[in-house]
Amino acid sequence: MKNDKIVKPFGFKDKIGYMFGDFGNDMTFLLSSSFLMKFYTDVMDVDGYIVGIIMMIARFVDAFTDVAMGRICDKSKMTAAGKFKPWIRRMCGPVAIVSFLMYQSSLSGLPKPAKIAYLFVTYILWGSVFYTSINIPYGSMASAISDNPNDRQSLSTFRTMGGMFAGAIIMAVVPLLIYNKENGNDVISGAKFTVVAGVCSLLAVVCYLLCYSLTTERVRAQATDAQLEKNNLGVMLKNAVKNRALISIIVASIFMLISQLTIQQMANYVFPNYYGNAKVQSLSVVMMGGGMVIAAVIAKPLAAKFGKAEISVVSNMVAGVVSLLLYFVRPQNVWVYVALQFLCWFGLGVFSMVVWALITDVIDYSEIKNGIREDGSVYALYSFARKLGQALTSGLSGALLSMIGYKKSTAFESQVKEGIFDISTLVPAISFILLALILWFWYPLKKKLVDENVEFLRKKHNKTEE
């Protein structure tokens, strides 16, 4: 049946609203991915490899909760607000509260087993339950806001900008607030960090509510109960394994997260430990954010002309080569290091600006391939990959920090500092290059095929509404 309800057209309000959604996401996600390891190694005195193991265990839990939430979204009935938006308002409070609970420095005097158990429980609740229950609907909502490829690219860009603004707060402002000077060294203050975590949680709730208020779901394609029953979880997973576009973008995104989060996590060690200057970490974020801003300006016109996957190959290869240069040159001047990292962030920024539009391309491709639209399920699998990338990074970083002998008592020894620099440059270099190769040789949705798929689905959906 044709829907006669007048829906306001896609506009700037949707872009801003969607931007606030990722701002809210990253107020807890980036705080965790960038500082949780540092908080537990330096404040709670838990070995890095243990923190990494807990994060990796949580990702196995996500294998079930992410997919389950995706199916819940696909089976949700359409409401006046849409199918995905209600979850954002419903779950913004719980995710913010549990995020705050993860950073309780007052518990640092507990026995180590108790601290490990506390981290495990709160991290599972935050990431595998509450963050999943808000992030899956939020990501799935992009394809429901508009079916126009240019609109979706705009949403992808504004989503990344929201993450950038959150990143500016997390990576630039937080380091200025959480360190004290002790014996000439920059040492993290647990009490200050707990307060900062509370402020980040409050900001997350505000941003989520703005996202809910400003966006509109327009594409109301919904699978019937019979289709969902026929295409059950087993069939969905079987189709996913055969979906070259989905699997390749999942693997590519894992390497993207490894490169990005390694740089972010290791910044907490490179600047205060290797360069002996935690203040530069905050200033460096401003410069690196400049690289992302330039990427935001040029990504959309370049993607429209050459294709999203095509420009991502070039940008990630540039970032990989620069990271290798850093590893071999090993600049002793911190500002030379920051200048070269600027180029890495520019390369990463181009891919970050288009990656969410790539996911909507994959959702379209899956609908054509399988005959059913499953925004929630496809996005859930991708979200699981992102969390897996986060866990692999934390596990890898934690293991490598333990391998080089990093502890609270050895944090400023010469050999340990050299190991910190190795991790911060070589791991991203390898990941950037592998990401570029995957997009070029494995990922099938280049510009020509994407344009054909969009036109096919537009005709299909218009015919269905008649």
Predicted regions and their residues:
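Membrane-embedded alpha-helical bundles of multi-pass transporters/translocases
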Residues: 2-466
